[in-house]
């Protein structure tokens, strides 16, 4: 289970940089308040659609495949605003991010349910919660530290995207633990 846990740590580390600093990045790029409000509306629409979009994948994936796919898509969503503030880029980023980020949490619950006996589900979910919390604590600090250097927030977003991509690679290494109990 260690690869899935490491992948989820990187999710916590990477996704939170996007959520913490996206408004600041968009403002730096000259995006106005109206478009930022639209950004959040579109992100929310993606969240509403996400469970419908990913339910089948979460039911079928027994190892870390779902976590890997979702982390990889989040890495792409995090990279997109680095390349500009064109309305289509911003829309693509927020829609992809919204359609994906909460399903990562669901992917860990699905992994636990597919791989551990019911008596161990609480402990399994607790382990994922702990590594996620650690990532959420460390992620904004590193993103902010990177953003304080040359390249500003773009560099911070590159760091977040790299963490998410690493999380995808780590999760992909996670094989099913055995038959569900």
Per-range role (PLM):
Residues 65-79, 158:
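Structural signature of the two symmetry-related core transmembrane helices
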């Amino acid at each position: 289970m260690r690869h899935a846990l490491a992948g989820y740590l990187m999710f916590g580390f990477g996704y939170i940089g996007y959520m913490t600093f996206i408004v600041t990045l968009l403002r730096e790029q000259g995006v106005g308040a109206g478009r930022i409000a639209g950004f959040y509306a579109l992100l929310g629409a993606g969240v509403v659609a996400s469970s419908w979009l990913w339910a089948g994948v979460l039911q079928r994936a027994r190892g870390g495949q779902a976590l890997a796919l979702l982390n990889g898509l989040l890495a792409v969503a995090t990279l997109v605003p680095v390349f500009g503030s064109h309305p289509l880029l911003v829309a693509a980023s927020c829609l992809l991010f919204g359609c994906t980020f909460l399903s990562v949490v669901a992917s860990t619950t699905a992994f636990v349910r597919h791989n551990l006996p019911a008596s161990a589900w609480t402990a399994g979910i607790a382990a994922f919660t702990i590594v996620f919390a650690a990532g959420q604590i460390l992620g904004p600090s590193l993103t902010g530290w990177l953003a304080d250097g040359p390249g500003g927030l773009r560099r911070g977003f590159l760091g977040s995207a790299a963490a998410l991509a690493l999380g995808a690679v780590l999760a992909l290494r996670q094989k099913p633990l055995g038959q569900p109990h």
